Structure formats: structure tokens, C-alpha cells
């Protein structure tokens, strides 16, 4: 059985009071790297190894210019996001249970990047193919 992993941006948050208090640019705003609804497909086989390349060119759906989205053809995933999602992507690509017992479906995980003033929320989903 072959496995792919789909990552979807399902939310973006902003905490302006924290940006005002702690950020060098107190008006930095929402994360510029991702958009709600962005979708990425990761494969790892003889032709592709998206995991090894930090998710470069895994973007399959966006409402923005693909060249400006992390994971698009021009830039790999943001390091803060990659740190949050890569372990689940790797597990899914190997056919493993992403979060058995915690999530309703063991092939899914909801996680977010570690930017505390403007986190991005991701759904990571293992897709099983014959």
C-alpha cells in the first residue's frame, strides 16, 4: 500500500497584544507564509521525496500567488511550521498511525506552528492508496 500525506491550513490566529508587547515590529500582523485553505500533498517514492526537500513544491491549492506561499515552487515550508508538522508527515508517509487514541481518526492530527503571536493551524492527514 502506498501512502501520501495531505496538509491543509485550517486556521490562522493573531494576538496583537502580544505583538505589541514583544515583537520588534509591533504591527507585524498575520503570518504571511500561509493562507487558510492552502493544501499540500507530500509523496515519498522513486520519483518524489517531498519530505527530504522540506516540502518544497508540495502546494496543490491556494487562493494566493503560489510563488508567495511557503511550500510552493519558490520556497520551502517555514521552519516553525515544518518543526510542527514534519513528524506527522513522516509518520503518515510510512503508513503509521499519526495520533491513535487522541484524535477521532488515527490518520489525522491537528497541530500548529510555534509562532506564539500569529500561529497557523494545520490538519495533517495520511491518505492510503492501493
Language model region names:
Residues 1-4, 34-39, 129:
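A short, structured loop/turn motif at beta-sheet edges
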Residues 9-13, 126-128:
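Beta-strand elements of well-folded, non-transmembrane domains
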Residues 3-5, 12-25:
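Short, structured beta-strand/loop micro-motifs enriched in basic residues and often containing a Trp
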Residues 15-17, 50, 130:
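Residue-level signal for secondary-structure boundary sites
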Residues 4-8, 121-123:
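Beta-strand secondary-structure signal
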Residues 21-48:
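Short, flexible N-terminal segments of the mature chain
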Residues 79-130:
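Short, compact, well-ordered microdomains
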Residues 47-80:
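Short, Lys/Arg- and Gly-enriched loop/turn segments at beta-strand edges
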Amino acid at each position: 500500500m502506498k501512502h501520501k500525506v495531505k496538509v491543509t491550513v485550517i486556521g490562522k490566529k493573531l494576538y496583537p497584544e502580544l505583538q505589541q508587547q514583544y515583537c520588534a515590529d509591533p504591527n507585524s500582523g498575520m503570518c504571511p507564509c500561509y493562507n487558510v485553505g492552502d493544501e499540500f500533498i507530500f509523496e515519498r517514492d522513486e520519483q518524489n521525496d517531498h519530505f527530504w526537500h522540506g516540502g518544497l513544491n508540495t502546494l496543490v491549492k491556494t487562493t494566493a500567488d503560489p510563488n508567495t506561499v511557503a511550500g510552493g515552487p519558490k520556497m520551502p515550508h517555514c521552519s516553525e511550521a515544518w518543526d510542527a508538522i514534519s513528524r506527522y508527515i513522516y509518520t503518515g508517509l510510512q503508513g503509521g498511525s499519526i495520533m491513535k487514541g487522541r484524535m477521532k481518526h488515527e490518520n489525522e492530527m491537528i497541530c500548529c506552528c510555534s509562532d506564539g503571536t500569529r500561529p497557523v493551524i494545520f490538519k495533517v492527514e495520511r491518505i492510503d492508496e492501493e
